Amino acid sequence: MMPAKLQLDVLRTLQSSARHGTQTLKNSNFLERFHKDRIVFCLPFFPALFFVPVQKVLQHLCLRFTQVAPYFIIQLFDLPSRHAENLAPLLASCRIQYTNCFSSSSNGQVPSIISLYLRVDLSPFYAKIFQISYRVPMIWLDVFQVFFVFLVISQHSLHS
């Protein structure tokens, strides 16, 4: 299990990572579910992403989450390909995997993520979507949303 001090550090990072704007953590209880083996970030592909400093936000998060790597498998979903190409070395160095599995999805719901882990018994599976809003200093663009999906799979499921 991740040390409590590191959990708090990660929480502070999530709450302060948008140096490029402001954000609101909608669910303050996320640490209750943020404790096993896997974190999945989902960046829904909006046209707005073309106007957002995604690279800077990700660089900041990557630097902070490097120390979490021993405790979690971190996967980043639906990163626009142009950002993925630029950030590939950084993501690899932080042991962060990425995929564009939602690019062809019409709704981008949690089952799309769950389908990637069919080999795992998901009966005690807990998933929660945390909605983070970034205020972007652009003339025509005010806000875009980033959904952090934390998938917590019990240790029993992983070994069954």
Swiss-Prot record:
Signal peptide: none annotated. The keyword Membrane applies. It comes from the Eukaryota. It is found in: Membrane. Keywords: Membrane, Transmembrane, Transmembrane helix. It is a multi-pass membrane protein. The chain crosses the membrane at residues 39-59, 136-156. One of its GO terms (cellular component) is membrane. Belongs to the UPF0479 family. This is UPF0479 membrane protein YER190C-B. It comes from Saccharomyces cerevisiae (strain ATCC 204508 / S288c) (Baker's yeast). The lineage of its organism: Eukaryota, Fungi, Dikarya, Ascomycota, Saccharomycotina.
